[in-house]
Amino acid sequence: MRISTAQLHAQGLAGMLGRQQEISRTQQELVTGNKLTRAAQDPAGAASAQRIDHALASLEQFERNSGLVGHRLRLQEGALGDAGDTLTRARELAIQGNNAALSDGDRTMLVAELRALQSQMLGIANRDDGNGRQLFAGTRDGVTPFALSAGNVSYAGDDGQNQVDIGPGLAVGDTNAGSEVFLRVRAGTGDVRGSADPGNSGRAVLQATSVADSAQWNGATLRLQFTGPDAYEIHDANGAVVSTGSYLSGDSIDVGGVTLRLTGAPAAGDGFDVQRAPNQAVFTTLQRLADAMAAPAATDAQRARRDNIISESLADLSSAQDHLLRMRADTGARLAAVDAAADTREAGEISMTETLSSLRDVDFAEAASRLTLHLTALEAAQATMMRVQGLSLFDRLR
């Protein structure tokens, strides 16, 4: 088979161009540190690297999300702790105020501190995260959730809670809505609430309420109605008499499965109500306690009314403290989930980075050796081309 001079030139040129392309690719790998400079070099590897890039970008977003929600949850945990301390102080003041020997001046000082505690609680409920977002506004940004007007606290947030993605298929709840934290708080014991009729004219004070038989009570609304200083009737929700009994100061009275302990002498017609514990805002609890202590107490009936509200408030405050402790424990559980997700993300990131490195990163020693090989091959091809160019039949005939 004869090979023409033109073919020899074409083959030689193609060989040199191929070597030059290999040299260029190898030099680019050494400069960039990336051996997947073109997808055509390794289509499967390039596709895998692209998937890992996307996964790593998602992990970075999850990390940013975790940082934000973790910061907000830590602030919520601190706010709940401060709110609990505020209620603890209010309870101490209530116990001090539940003292018949207290002077009017001392009681006035207690009332002033209770008012300050209410303002303090409002400030806690309106805290933000330092980035312009309220902690307790639910999903509503840009609003101050709580406002005090004419002695009443209103809520401008909503009941929602944002769910924040912190890992693949894993989301955690953001801070709780203020309505859940500060408004929907069970009064009384959390299960049942006993309260004195504000129209009572006797001196009886309800000291404690507790559920003795939950099956018997079953959440029923009942009323203890005194027919005299030492006799009473139990009425159901329809006003029907279901039982009667006699009373001595300090007695515990069973009211349909709920035990009421009273002291003092009631008047005929005085009543005490038993009901399933309703929700009561912590602001209302503080306001009610302060108002009761500030109210005139010149008569036995007025003093009994004040003491009944203080007694009820002590139960309400204890229930509110338990509520905040539960909220704080739930917040801690979410923070633990954020921390656990961070550990999982870190492990995943290390694994994916190692895989990506094996797919993409250049082995510099191997690439340098390969470059030397390609350069040597190019020099040999160039030398061969030069020799071929010098060959011709006329040279042989000289």
Spans of model-derived segments:
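Amphipathic alpha-helical polymerization modules
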Residues: 1-150, 172, 277, 284-398
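Cysteine-poor, low-complexity segments in flexible/peripheral regions
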Residues: 144-302
